[in-house]
């Protein structure tokens, strides 16, 4: 009898570990394998209980996409080169770094990316991703050859950072001598983002942040991770562009409606949105429209965030209320 009780206790102990949450904020930002939805409680699946909005945290498309997540049918090598026409210019510090093969390889780790919805939706997501990341890495200027929107991906890391971007954190402690300034296509910043991203993609970015600016596949993975991962109260960029995000009454009251403009709000709304006409927002739109034209897809409406209150202001008021 005692031996049976002991076996039961051992089984229960092991079961508690096997049932640990699998994804989302409960698992350090991890994504579900094979494009499965991450439920609001941190579990992976493909039914409505996992994928319904609001609640679903990432990859909320329902039925998982194909097993490879290969985007070569959505964006060709020649289109990639045309979009990022001057990335290898001698004036660009990132010349030779960002390659088509690195992008395609990295995207395979995120099966929902660029594979959700119909062909037009998939192309819009790729155009939106490169539109936003091109602004973050642009080397263009108003009179640049081929126009300012042909100079995305000119940089791979922040120039002359004024901070080491280290925020005190027990969960994501900064490594000695390391700085967490902007790196890669999305200019990933701060130790807590490096920590969560590293856990999700299987690389120790807390101790090796330079991997994001030294390894092009990891650079793209870090950018796509940011794109696919919601950070409450913000939805993921992915959920917005594929039409999975449904704004709440509070979102609508703040002017946040589905469209490319909300993605700008997610990425840098605290500095760029709700200020009327803004050159930075216009720059993001210019890249996106050019890429939509190359990929042959309509960019849709609601492209700016000029009159949107930022998600950051939502955080502020919630904190003040608490």
UniProtKB/Swiss-Prot annotation:
GO terms for molecular function: chitin binding; endochitinase activity. Coiled coil: none annotated. It is an enzyme of class 3 (hydrolase). Keywords: Carbohydrate metabolism, Chitin degradation, Chitin-binding, Disulfide bond, Glycosidase, Hydrolase, Polysaccharide degradation, Signal. InterPro entries: Chitin-bd_1 (IPR001002), Chitin-binding_1_CS (IPR018371), Endochitinase-like_sf (IPR036861), Glyco_hydro_19 (IPR016283), Glyco_hydro_19_cat (IPR000726), Lysozyme-like_dom_sf (IPR023346). Its EC number is 3.2.1.14. Pfam families: Chitin_bind_1, Glyco_hydro_19. Induction: In roots by wounding and ethephon. It comes from the Eukaryota. This is Endochitinase CH25. It comes from Brassica napus (Rape). The lineage of its organism: Eukaryota, Viridiplantae, Streptophyta, Embryophyta, Tracheophyta.
